[in-house]
Amino acid sequence: MQQTLIIGAFDGLHKGHQLLAQAASGPVVALLIANIPSLQSDWLYEPKQRQVQLQQHFQSVVHSYDVIEHNISAQAFFDQIISPLRCQQLVVGADFCFGKDNQNADFLRRLFPNTTIIPKDSQTLSSSTIRQWLKQGQIEQANAVLLEPYFREGVVIRGNQQARFLGWPTANITLKPYMVPLRCGSYVITVTYHQTNYPGVGFISYKNDQLVCETHLIGFSGDLYGKQLRFTFNQFIRPQQKFSGVQALQKAISGDLKQAQKWFAQSTN
């Protein structure tokens, strides 16, 4: 049976990536470009997360390639990486570039004539656009084009207990510096723990120059320190702001909780 190879970083699978899979004439094999020298930060997802998404959404066999460790010419990349996969069709986007000599999709088609190039005007979406939306807090715009709502994963760490003192204990994770920096402020968040989803309100801010997400799980009681959780971002509520005192802060948090409860009530209807 014919197999089709799709190639890309696939950083945040979106509807534009679907065009690659839809152009396939057979079962899809994905060559995941794990790292890119020109993109040292602002990643949407870790390589392992991108691999899992490809497997789940495209039912793909996934091969991973690290450009930073093996930065070779386009010809060598074709000979050593693409050819051994023995696929009968290649599908790439019009802006696809490969090799340390930065060759383009037309060069790839000269090497492999059965290469389908998805026109750029058909790829109205891009990971770069999604990154900008997330930096601006435009979560709902990003989620509308992503194949699954945007999430982060992390191990819960101990915070300064301030939220617990105020009556809203939180599960805190640090957001890795090489990932796209999300806008500081409050969010409606779904927390996944042991395959169970909990509604929550999260707050992103800088603590000692490190971006941290502090999330209150509505209706949850228990010890989550050291546990691996998934935080799915559903809606941006408000930007970070300074408060005149504890009462003003508590009032704002209460408003955040009401907005989150409203969002979850509407999402289940």
Swiss-Prot record:
SMART domains: Flavokinase. GO terms for molecular function: ATP binding; FMN adenylyltransferase activity; riboflavin kinase activity. NCBIfam families: ribF (TIGR00083). It comes from Mycoplasma pneumoniae (strain ATCC 29342 / M129 / Subtype 1). The gene is ribF. This is Bifunctional riboflavin kinase/FMN adenylyltransferase. Pathway: Cofactor biosynthesis; FAD biosynthesis; FAD from FMN: step 1/1; Cofactor biosynthesis; FMN biosynthesis; FMN from riboflavin (ATP route): step 1/1. It comes from the Bacteria. GO terms for biological process: FAD biosynthetic process; FMN biosynthetic process; riboflavin biosynthetic process. Catalyzes the phosphorylation of riboflavin to FMN followed by the adenylation of FMN to FAD. Keywords: ATP-binding, FAD, Flavoprotein, FMN, Kinase, Multifunctional enzyme, Nucleotide-binding, Nucleotidyltransferase, Transferase.
